[in-house]
Amino acid sequence: MSTSGALTGYYVDSIVIPGSEETRFSSGLGLIQHRPTILPADLSDLGPCTFPAKQPVYGTSDWGHIPTHFSTGVPSVYQPHAQPPVVGDYVQSWLLDSACGLPQTEPPTVNHNHAKSDTNETNDDGTEYSPHTILQPEVFTNGGCSTKTEAESSRTAEKSGDIEGKPGADPENPVSNWLHASSTRKKRCPYTKHQILELEKEFLFNTYLTRDRRYEVARLLNLTERQVKIWFQNRRMKMKKFNKNETKED
């Protein structure tokens, strides 16, 4: 009950103090106006304040004592996730280098996949290979290994065949390679038989076409006006050359 007695004194002091403070400050400061105090006529009418005893919150609950610490072991709820066995389809090249010097009686059954840069490396013969090249069990024969695939071997064979096919190509002479290089000029698209036939008919009627007629012929034959113009120029040059050869023969 000491708590209730202290609270009772606190409430009584809070009611009495404002009156005494007003009388104390009113003499010093004239600007402060007196507030009407709302006090009861007789303070003896106030009875002692009593508060009910605080009931325990978990007094009647069914909750048992909760331990504040847990066991250091793994709780029973935790179930570790089983990782599947790693079976990679690729063999790293840096693992193969160490495996090449060891004799193997049987092909390896388990491949390991380790992280490595994707940069291409070069074999001793100058061919490039990737570290992610798929190797078949047949590659490991007689304790050795080979990283050259069938695609790379066919590619090198085609390159060697192209060099041999060129009559004057010299792999060590860059000038010879430049002279025998293929032309980079865009190939002209040939006209279809129907287009050539219609252009020949038009050329028989008139060797020179007007601009409007060229646009009309180009629209009918699904060509551009420039293509029709160039074809007629070439056809006139061919006709002049043919006539010149006939006059020489006569």
UniProtKB/Swiss-Prot annotation:
The keyword Flavoprotein does not apply. One of its GO terms (molecular function) is DNA-binding transcription factor activity. Signal peptide: none annotated. Pfam families: Homeodomain (PF00046), Hox9_act (PF04617). Its main location: nucleus. The keyword Transmembrane does not apply. One of its GO terms (cellular component) is nucleus. Residues 149-169 have a biased composition (Basic and acidic residues). One of its GO terms (biological process) is regulation of transcription by RNA polymerase II. Residues 184-243 bind DNA. It is found in: Nucleus. Keywords: Developmental protein, DNA-binding, Homeobox, Nucleus, Transcription, Transcription regulation. It comes from the Eukaryota. PROSITE patterns: HOMEOBOX_1, HOMEOBOX_2. Residues 105-177 are annotated as: Disordered. PANTHER family: AGAP004664-PA, HOMEOBOX PROTEIN HOX-A9. Sequence-specific transcription factor which is part of a developmental regulatory system that provides cells with specific positional identities on the anterior-posterior axis. Belongs to the Abd-B homeobox family. This is Homeobox protein Hox-A9a. It comes from Danio rerio (Zebrafish).
